[in-house]
Amino acid sequence: MVKYLSQSEAIELDLDLFEMFHVGQLMELAGLSCADAVAECFPAQTHPRVLVVCGPGNNGGDGLVCARHLSLMGYQPTVYYPKPTLMSLYENLTNQCHHMEIPSVKKCPSVSDAEEDYDLILDALFGFGFKPPVREDFVPLVKMMQETKVPIASVDIPSGWDVEKGKQSECDFEPKLLISLTAPKLCAEHFKGEHHYLGGRFVPPALQRKYQLNLPDYGSKLVVRL
């Protein structure tokens, strides 16, 4: 069985990966994996309009990469990136989205606007470094995801969930799709949605052994269903 990681294990594993790979490499593979999982569950023919919600950390970077790949797969992504990270990596990812003519919005959509304008929300707001409660700046966005009927695909962690314990009283939305990256986190044991995929096919054998990950065989696929 695949190992589910604690928050501290996930952080330590990421630091080990950063010593072996450039963060941009890992982000590119993670974001591509997310796009592939979305395509598996929500085809562009039925869910073309995707709101990609990006947070200020690595999870947001994964979202920007995912938006770019979704546009190449025939989707119509729109990016909402309320707190951009002022580092060259993230600025480059944002510019790449501009070059792909991916539109962005500056204001958090209301529940009614989200349901009128989008067929899917990609939640790339908070990653496994998150600790409750949700920062005040992001409360309206999390509230919208709480209340919307638009299906949600969460990248690695459903935003606002405790990384180990799962849903919190102030944030208990259930995404339709959870895309765990590298290895699933303990909160994924509480996931009750329809689709759970694992992506991030980049963990060297030595790290798989160190953390006893017992990862599934991807074969030629970018993601595997859990």
Curated annotation (Swiss-Prot):
Domain called YjeF N-terminal: residue spans: 10-215
PROSITE patterns reported for this sequence: YJEF_N (PS51385)
UniProt-listed Enzyme Commission number(s): 5.1.99.6
GO MF term list: metal ion binding; NAD(P)HX epimerase activity; nucleotide binding
Cofactor binding note: Binds 1 potassium ion per subunit.
Ligand binding (K(+)): 59, 123, 159
Binding, (6S)-NADPHX: 58-62, 127-133, 156
UniProt entry keywords in alphabetical sequence: Isomerase, Metal-binding, NAD, NADP, Nucleotide-binding, Potassium
Cofactor: K(+)
Source organism superkingdom: Eukaryota
Pfam families in the cross-refs: YjeF_N
GO CC annotation terms, alphabetical: mitochondrion
Catalysed reactions, semicolon-separated: (6R)-NADHX = (6S)-NADHX; (6R)-NADPHX = (6S)-NADPHX
InterPro entries: YjeF_N_dom, YjeF_N_dom_sf, YJEFN_prot_NAXE-like
Family annotation (PANTHER family): NAD(P)H-HYDRATE EPIMERASE
Homology family: Belongs to the NnrE/AIBP family.
NCBIfam families in the record: yjeF_nterm (TIGR00197)
Record function comment: Catalyzes the epimerization of the S- and R-forms of NAD(P)HX, a damaged form of NAD(P)H that is a result of enzymatic or heat-dependent hydration. This is a prerequisite for the S-specific NAD(P)H-hydrate dehydratase to allow the repair of both epimers of NAD(P)HX.
Protein name, per record: NAD(P)H-hydrate epimerase
Organism whose genome encodes this protein: Drosophila pseudoobscura pseudoobscura
